[in-house]
Each structure stands twice: as C-alpha cells, then as structure tokens.
Amino acid sequence: MKQGDRIPGLVGWEHHGAPAKIPGLEVVAEGLVWSGGVTSSRYTATIVPGPKNNFVFNAATIFWAQGLASPPGHMPPWSHWARPAGPDPRVQRITENLLRRALGG
C-alpha cells in the first residue's frame, strides 16, 4: 500500500489517536475518522521498537481482526456509524508481513 490508500471499514469505534513520543516509533498509518458520525477524530497505527530486537504493532483499531477472516457463524460488530467491511487481502498481507518480521524472516 502507499500513502493515501484506504481500507474502508477497518477503523472501528475504538481507535487510538496521536502516538506517544517514543524514540524509534514509526507511524505506519494515520488519518481521520468520524466519531459518532459527526466529529472528526484522528487515528494512528504504529510500530514501536522493543529492547531485544523485537517490536510492538499497534493497529489503532478494534476492527483489525475483522479484516483477517470471517469464520462460519461469525457476526460482524457494528455500532456508532461504524461497520467492518470483512476480510481484506491487504489486511491479511500486512499481518503476514508483521508476523514474518517478528519471526526474523
């Protein structure tokens, strides 16, 4: 993906705003969402380096798992003008890349 690309329905009603000032923190996605359908709010997804050549990925959204899979019987959540769009190959690929990075590959 490149700057400006969007994944509709990925940022849910719970999301993280401006990141903390942490050395080495990398912003990997950011943008505006509409809180309550009327008020704009910022979300920021980040990767934070750890002390042992590890990292923490903060997707900044409660809906990240919705972009990975939709098993039989799964009922997608929706509320507050937010509804996930379901599995998305880009979310799956981003997650795969993060797991490969975590495993050192």
Put a short name on every predicted segment:
Residues 1-105:
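Extracellular ligand-binding/catalytic regions of CAZymes and related secreted enzymes
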